[in-house]
Amino acid sequence: AFKRLKTDKKLVIAGGVSDSGDYMNTLRALAAGDDRILFTDFVDGALRDELYSNAYLFVLPSDLEGMPLSLLEAMSYGNCVLVSDIEECTNVIHDRGITFRQGDVNDLEAKLRYAIEHPIAVRMFKQLSSDYICDRFQWDKVVDATLKLYQTP
């Protein structure tokens, strides 16, 4: 989807995948010849902070997730997020991000284009993101809710 867009923005595909190396090899082959697309292995520390802090948009095109920690992290850094419309992602972002239909490359392309062409909307989502996620998933609140769950007969 990204290769179809005319933009000077970069796409950083960070981290590994849980499936296999074959998937990453397929992605690398699809990205061949496009110097806007960069691959990293697993990132943490200062590099992770740098990527989150400077991202225009965080994209999570998952088909299957548990509680997507990378999504929580991205939002805590105040990123505008674009996620597939699977329940695990939509339950996290509610109306504070952009969704696309799972597995629909054309819809992903359309939403990427929207984000690139509407920086004011992206800025609005960035402003909504951090406070919301840090309040909703604050450790003390999560611990209290978990404790109540275990104490319920």
Predicted regions and their residues:
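Short alpha-helical donor nucleotide-sugar binding micro-motif in glycosyltransferases
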Residues: 42-43, 50-55, 146
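Short hydrophobic beta-strand element within catalytic cores of glycosyltransferases
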Residues: 80-83
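A short, well-ordered alpha-helix in the C-terminal region of glycosyltransferases
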Residues: 114, 121-135, 145
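Nucleotide-activated donor-binding/catalytic signature segment of Leloir-type glycosyltransferases, i.e.
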Residues: 24-46
